[in-house]
Curated annotation (Swiss-Prot):
Monomer. One of its GO terms (cellular component) is cytosol. It comes from the Bacteria. Keywords: Carbohydrate metabolism, Glycogen biosynthesis, Glycogen metabolism, Glycosyltransferase, Transferase. HAMAP family: GlgB. NCBIfam families: branching_enzym, PRK05402.1, PRK12313.1. Pathway: Glycan biosynthesis; glycogen biosynthesis. This is 1,4-alpha-glucan branching enzyme GlgB. InterPro entries: A-amylase/branching_C, Branching_enzy, GlgB, GlgB_N, GlgB_N_E_set_prok, Glyco_hydro_13_cat_dom, Glyco_hydro_13_N, Glyco_hydro_b. The active site is at 397 (nucleophile), 450 (proton donor). Its EC number is 2.4.1.18. CDD domains: AmyAc_Glg_BE, E_set_GBE_prok_N.
Length: 712
């Protein structure tokens, strides 16, 4: 054997940090030298474009070959494996993938289209088909691509490191559909678990964890939703859906994206919803996380099909006129060995200090928003879903956990910011910039924050000090009102303020009223399960509460199953209890939600000024003894008015007087006590005439709400 250099041994042992320095074509003392590493090959030749064939000598039994050609030229390798001879392109003859400008933007953390450069991209280089791989691992000693194309041999395709710690390699003949991972040696020479690609566009079905090459430029682009569908003056009624448990096959198997596309959008449209919000669809290893612990932020989960199939689902929603929102999780990630944690042998995506980098409640890792590469990665992910899949909005999960350094931490268990405060300044900057970029690139899209504290101006523009979200979930409204309706009616007069209090701050943000998945799990019971009394009272209570919600200022969100009054808590491992609709009580609730949605959409007074104080006036606030509330909703037109009267007691009230803003005849356009919904059919015979002093003399049905609008 020829005496080998340390570089040659580094190639053989799979630990060379810059294989292009040794492999490929090089000028050595005026000679054109070709070196190749092909384990299992018994013979290798270099075949030049000019027809020259140069034999390469085997200089090590591991598969290291070298030889000379007459001069620099394009070439390919002709290798013999057993009885088989094949021509191969040499990955180490190609120029870099990333440009200097790419590296400049990556170094600044300003590459808005990170998904065009990082990850795995089918491409043609120098006339050769293959896949370009790029990954961030600044502290790694060596990174290799392993996959179907090299028998998962880390010595076959070590990558080259570019500026700022980005590793890249073009692998000829790799193709869409190939499975792959990154094999990384850490800064101390330690061999890390194989890592999935943080930028992968698809991944294997759990429990397998390989990434899958996708030519995402060939993905079909879903048709757009109506451009004004997210605006503040439009009706926004959101159907929140967990794709794995909305409906299942007879064998309890999931519906695929395409099967969901055939059923879900048409159902949501028939029910009157304007939006569908999917619980996180990014790839995640644990079903029980519901998607809130993702490992593949750029990959729709393979549980239900391919990226193309997910496109079909989004397109089907848009075809029905529905906007699609995704739950987006930039707040934390799991520490599964194949994931982002300790990615290059150091805390790359997370904080090194567990007082900053580990979430105590969930056992997950927290992103280091102060690291430009990490913030760039997350912002780019937000833009990716909007551009590549035509998503119309992002609901950002667990914003409070991002904003506060001491979130769910004991005294002494957190690190203050540079001013000594508890605010996470880097997270604030990240959220603001994300919203600026989302609205800047996709003005028709929106964002919504699940923020459970009193942080100010969450849904106000960044230039006036806000966080820049389009909407904020009104968690306070949800907690107060559910607590109120959970009381026995005889005690509600002592809790009257829990209904009134929400209007003190109802217009401080652009609020969404959420009855979400979080309210029907972990022993909280279903929404119906929270209602007191016998069956009649429970269902009447629920009808009144839903009606109260749709009459209240704010956009609406209802988790799947709430619309059919599911009795049990939500279980992600099984379908909703659709069989309940065979019982008139449950079918009545479904009919109620359908009619409330259509009423909300068709009455401008109920949605045009959802987020403006000018769109609301109290009419009755002091009738605690009878558990009655009344208010008027107002649209832009002076006759766009809707009076809502809610009776949260089981009593019928006759001759109940309510002063209204306009004289004349008022039509009762909705009554939750209608027998159509399972009620007792007490009401106002369709219309009421206002007296000279603009008062209506009403019959208030028990545990019910009535909506009245002026005659045109």
């Amino acid at each position: 054997m020829t005496h080998l250099s340390p570089e040659a041994f580094a190639i053989i042992e799979g630990r060379h940090a810059d294989p292009f320095r040794y492999l490929g074509q090089h000028d050595v003392d005026g000679r054109t030298v070709i070196r190749a590493f092909l384990p299992e090959a018994s013979r290798v030749e270099a075949v030049g474009d000019n027809g020259e064939v140069a034999p390469l000598a085997r200089i090590h039994d591991a598969g290291l070959f070298t030889g000379t050609m007459s001069g620099p030229q394009r070439y390919r390798l002709r290798a013999t494996f057993g009885d088989h001879v094949t021509d191969l392109e040499d990955p180490y003859r190609f120029l870099p993938i990333l440009t200097d400008f790419d590296l400049h933007l990556l170094g600044e953390g300003n590459h808005e289209r990170l998904y065009d450069k990082l990850g795995a991209h089918p491409m043609v280089l120098d006339g050769v088909d293959g896949v370009g791989f790029v990954v961030l691992a600044p502290n790694a000693r060596r990174v290799s691509v392993v996959g179907d194309f090299n028998f998962w041999n880390a010595r076959r395709h070590p990558m080259r490191v570019r500026g700022n710690g980005y590793w890249e390699l073009f692998i000829p003949r790799a193709k869409a559909g190939d499975h792959y991972k990154f094999d990384i040696i850490g800064p101390q020479g330690e061999h890390l678990p194989l890592k999935s690609d943080p930028m992968a566009f698809a991944a294997e079905m759990r429990p397998k964890t390989a990434s899958i090459v996708v030519d995402e430029t060939r993905l079909p682009r879903p048709r757009p939703a109506p451009s004004d569908i997210n605006k503040l003056d439009r009706p926004v009624s959101i159907y929140e859906v967990h794709l794995g448990s909305w409906r299942r096959k007879d064998n309890n198997q999931w519906l695929t994206y395409r099967e969901l596309a055939e059923q879900l959008p048409a159902y949501a449209r028939d029910m009157g919803f304007t939006h569908i919000e999917f619980l996180p669809v990014s790839e995640h290893p644990f079903d029980g996380s519901w998607g809130y612990q993702p490992t593949g932020l750029f990959a729709p989960t393979s549980r239900f099909g391919s990226p193309e199939d997910f496109c079909a689902l989004v397109d089907a929603c848009h075809r029905e006129g529905l906007a699609v929102w995704l739950d987006w999780v930039p707040g934390h990630f799991p520490d599964d060995p194949h994931g982002l944690g300790h990615f290059d042998g150091t805390a790359l995506y997370e904080h090194a200090n567990p007082m900053q980098g580990r979430h105590l409640d969930w056992g997950t890792l927290i992103y280091n928003y102060g690291r430009t590469e990490v913030a760039n990665f997350l912002r780019s992910n937000a833009l990716f879903w909007l551009e590549r899949y035509g998503i119309d909005g992002l609901r950002v999960d667990a914003v409070a956990s991002m904003l506060y350094l001491d979130y769910s931490r004991p005294s002494g268990g957190w690190i203050p910011n540079k001013y000594g405060g508890r605010e996470n300044l880097e997270a604030i900057e990240f959220l603001r910039r994300t919203n600026i970029e989302v609205f800047g690139h996709f003005p028709q899209a929106t964002t919504a924050a699940e923020e459970s504290t009193a942080w100010p101006q969450v849904s106000r523009p960044v230039d006036i000090g806000g966080l820049g979200f389009g909407y904020k979930w009104n968690m306070g409204w949800m907690h107060d009102t559910l607590r109120y309706v959970g009381k026995d009616p005889i005690h509600r007069k002592y809790h009257h303020g829990e209904i009134l209090f929400g209007l003190h701050y109802a217009f401080s943000e652009n609020f969404i009223l959420p009855l979400s998945h979080d309210e029907v799990v972990h022993g909280k019971r279903s929404i119906l399960g929270r209602m007191p009394g016998d069956d009649w009272q429970r269902f009447a209570n629920l009808r009144a509460y839903y009606s109260f919600m749709f009459g209240h200022p704010g956009k609406k969100l209802l988790f799947m199953g709430c619309e059919i009054a599911q009795e049990r808590e939500w279980n992600h491992d099984s379908s909703l209890d659709w069989h309940l609709l065979g019982d008139a009580k449950y079918a009545g609730i479904q009919a109620l939600i359908r009619d409330l949605n259509h009423l909300y959409r068709n009455q401008p007074a109920l949605h045009e000024r959802d987020c403006e104080p000018e769109g609301f006036d109290w009419l009755i606030t002091e009738d605690a003894d009878r558990n009655v509330f009344a208010w008027v909703r107002k649209g832009f037109d002076e006759r766009a008015r809707c009076v809502v009267v809610v009776n949260f007691s089981p009593n019928v009230y006759y001759n109940y007087r309510v002063r209204v803003p306009l004289g004349g005849t008022w039509r009762e356009v909705f009554n939750s006590d209608s027998s159509h919904y399972g009620g007792s059919n007490v009401g106002n015979v369709g219309q009421v005439h206002a007296s000279e002093d603009q008062q209506l003399n009403l019959i208030l049905p028990p545990m019910a709400a009535v909506f009245l609008v002026p005659e045109a």
